[in-house]
């Protein structure tokens, strides 16, 4: 088994010349390699809809974790229910932070997402994902190279130093248009916020719509240097 510790033995390669640009092959390999020790960390963005559909074909009982920060858009929570109905056999886990919003405010002040967004992300996303990955050998992410400068070198299989794990990214070669084409082709549910200028959807407090021609991550932590929550730093 390929693990974080045995990374030097990595000799896995995949063809990108199929209909899914390698995504199904990558997922088939991952679930065979790790069996029950892999989880998909899903934010329920539009890429997530594609991956959930593909994963359901490969492993209908796969584990899916959603990092419920308690400050997501209502549309996101409604979408999760639609996904549960569309893919009832998937094991979708809504992972909560240890601190409630009230407890966080007492410790760090109100609106931590404004005063210290990095700490807010650590409490409400990074630490919960660490807990979710504690007993896993690998995790799946919907990163695409096209999304931003920080993601353009992502590979199918990555040694993830942040979580000391293997990070599997099946959609790295997909374009934004290809993602949507797949969603429409298979009549997949998606977050209606995508239709009003939100290409990337995170917490309600830190996500704004993006103007035409903007980077897909421009609406995240707008006005700050920050463009990543910290889950994908190497």
UniProtKB/Swiss-Prot annotation:
Annotated source species: Bacillus cereus (strain ZK / E33L)
Protein name: Adenosine 5'-phosphosulfate reductase
Enzyme class: oxidoreductase
Chain ranges passing through the membrane: none
Predominant subcellular localization, coarse grouping: cytoplasm
Record carries keyword Iron: yes
HAMAP family recorded: CysH
Biological role: Catalyzes the formation of sulfite from adenosine 5'-phosphosulfate (APS) using thioredoxin as an electron donor.
Active site annotation, chain numbering: 229
Pathway: Sulfur metabolism; hydrogen sulfide biosynthesis; sulfite from sulfate
